[in-house]
């Protein structure tokens, strides 16, 4: 679906850096169908909305809310590109980290003017490979955020890391820099599959990294990929049992998908047989739930209280900023919701677009969607928005569970989420 076009900010990015000139103090303008939102540097706690020339300006609207608010920092650089990865990343061994981080800080300043009365509840460093960032620069980013926004006392500050670092003090340095949640990209628990997946670490390095993370952090997670080439159910069952025994607070289990544009796609690698992938998924849910890791989202399992707070911002439709190349965000200003899809450009979401996003993300969660919250967030009546005939059909197929207050996908339904959304919104 095509979104309404956003207005340009009136200033141009520097061709060399991709960032706006540091000396600029831009006026930010967003065109919508019924309003012009016009904010200049400094009055960021308020916006002015002019509906038409005859009515003039309406009273200023405060931005401050009590909802969670997060900041995502995207580091797109990697030492190598995994053959299954379709995220935006660049293979570069040497980059000017200090200069890039300066640009990130400028972008944080820019958005702080719009949101500085919000309290930051989570910061997440993703990629790419954000563990390549120098720890002192990570500390600089965290400190800068804390200077620009109130930072919640219990803020979750998470970073994704690979197990193959040649820096022996990496994890202690990251902890000292302010990271309090560490997620390790293990992906497989045997050397052969690690090679197939294009990972640059071996199993010995994975175990060493896990030992260090468990020692240095109280909040931690590992990622594994299932439905790998030639993997059978018995092999995955053994791997799940191992993963549950390590003692990590959180586990992410992702089914391998063959995405267009990836190396696996270009090689014509077939996806896993559907029934096998379903068996793996169902065993994962059952075993981890029985061993202290209940599923809370389609790919995520956690000991109670250790669910990823930052990722829940996405699934709950909360506000977050995206900093760095290809990073995106969502932001509510006044009564309007905006998508931050391009560098410092905000595109207004229609109520229908907002509703579709809430459905797509919320149905990933085991608890589903609270209909009252849905209506508050998009301004549409749930029953009027949903295709009632298709809803009843999906309930009969045991893909959805619908009550007076909530709607949620069953285990089977979460495996075909795209189809569910298409049907419900048709």
Predicted regions mapped to residue ranges:
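Minor-groove-contacting beta-hairpin "wing" of winged helix-turn-helix DNA-binding domains
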Residues: 406-410
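Long, intrinsically disordered low-complexity tandem-repeat segments
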Residues: 5-20, 35, 41-58
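Local cysteine-cluster metal-coordination motifs and their immediate loop/turn environment
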Residues: 76-87
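Short, amphipathic alpha-helical interaction segments positioned at domain boundaries
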Residues: 414-426
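N-terminal [4Fe-4S]-dependent radical SAM core
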Residues: 2-3, 28-31, 37, 47, ...
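C-terminal scaffold of the Radical SAM
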Residues: 68-70, 89-113, 118-383
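A short, conserved structural fragment
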Residues: 395-405
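Short amphipathic alpha-helical interaction segments
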Residues: 381-393
């Amino acid at each position: 679906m095509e979104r309404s076009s956003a207005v340009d900010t009136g200033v141009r990015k520097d061709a060399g850096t991709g960032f706006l000139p540091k000396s600029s103090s831009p006026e930010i303008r967003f065109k919508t169908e019924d309003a012009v939102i016009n904010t200049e540097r400094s009055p960021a706690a308020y916006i002015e909305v002019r509906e038409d020339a005859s009515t003039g300006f309406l009273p200023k609207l405060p931005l401050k809310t009590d909802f969670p608010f997060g900041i995502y920092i995207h580091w797109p650089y990697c030492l190598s590109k995994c053959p299954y990865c379709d995220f935006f990343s660049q293979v570069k061994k040497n980059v000017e980290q200090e200069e890039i981080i300066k640009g990130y800080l400028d972008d944080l300043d820019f958005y702080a003017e719009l949101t500085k009365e919000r309290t930051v509840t989570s910061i997440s460093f993703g990629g790419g490979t954000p563990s390549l960032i120098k720890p002192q620069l990570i500390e600089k980013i965290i400190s800068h955020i804390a200077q620009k926004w109130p930072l919640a006392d219990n803020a979750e500050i998470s970073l994704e890391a690979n197990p193959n670092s040649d820096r022996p003090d990496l994890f202690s340095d990251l902890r000292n820099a302010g990271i309090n949640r560490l997620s390790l990209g293990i992906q497989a628990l045997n050397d052969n599959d690690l090679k197939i997946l294009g990972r640059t670490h071996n199993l010995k390095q994975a175990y060493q990294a896990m030992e260090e993370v468990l020692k240095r952090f109280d909040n931690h997670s590992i990622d594994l990929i299932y439905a790998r080439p030639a993997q059978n159910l018995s092999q995955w069952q053994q791997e799940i049992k191992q993963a549950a025994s390590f003692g990590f607070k959180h586990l992410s289990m992702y089914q391998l998908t063959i995405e267009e544009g990836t190396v696996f796609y270009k090689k014509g690698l077939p996806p896993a047989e559907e029934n096998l992938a379903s068996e793996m998924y169902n065993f994962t849910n059952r075993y981890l739930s029985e061993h202290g890791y209940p599923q809370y989202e389609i790919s995520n399992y956690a000991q109670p209280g250790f669910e990823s707070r930052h990722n829940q911002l996405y699934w709950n439709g909360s506000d977050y900023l995206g900093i760095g190349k290809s990073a995106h965000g969502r932001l509510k200003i006044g009564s309007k919701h905006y998508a931050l899809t391009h560098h410092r450009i905000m595109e207004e979401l229609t109520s229908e677009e907002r509703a579709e996003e809430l459905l797509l993300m919320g149905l990933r969660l085991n608890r589903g969607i609270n209909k009252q919250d849905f209506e508050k967030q998009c301004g549409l009546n749930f029953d009027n928005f949903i295709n009632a005939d298709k809803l009843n059909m999906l309930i009969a197929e045991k893909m959805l569970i619908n009550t007076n207050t909530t709607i949620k996908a069953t285990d089977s339904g979460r495996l075909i989420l795209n189809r569910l959304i298409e049907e419900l919104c048709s």
